[in-house]
């Protein structure tokens, strides 16, 4: 249904990663910050814009995400996406809302996700009972946390998904799909 993808600076390459480090140092030292690889300052900031703007106010990155999801899962799936560049070095994360055809049991959803190859559920309902982008670094797993029923729709769930994009990017995911 809906996905907000938080993309780390590594998704843009090495120069943007270096820029995040430089901007962070400059910010903490009270220096003027310049942006070469981003449309705005990335250090201590979020940029709700990745790639160029195209149809209906979406960006190329958002359309790419929508089309890839349809290609992998189902061409008829209805999805909307917002992609945000975040001041995180490596891992991408997504806040996802999924609607099912009928009501479901949240425990069953967690069990199915936990049994999925390359997926690990870390979902404790307490402070720190979830995975963060930093904790997902250097792992080939995709972590799922904050799994809960959507309070506005009894056929939908919300969840938080994180993976190290340098290790588990599109190429590895494609290979896993074919195996």
Located regions from the model:
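Conserved small/polar residues in nucleotide/adenosyl-binding loops
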Residues: 2-6, 178-179
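C-terminal substrate-binding/catalytic lobe of Rossmann-fold NAD(P)-dependent oxidoreductases
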Residues: 5-158
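Generic C-terminus detector
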Residues: 156-177
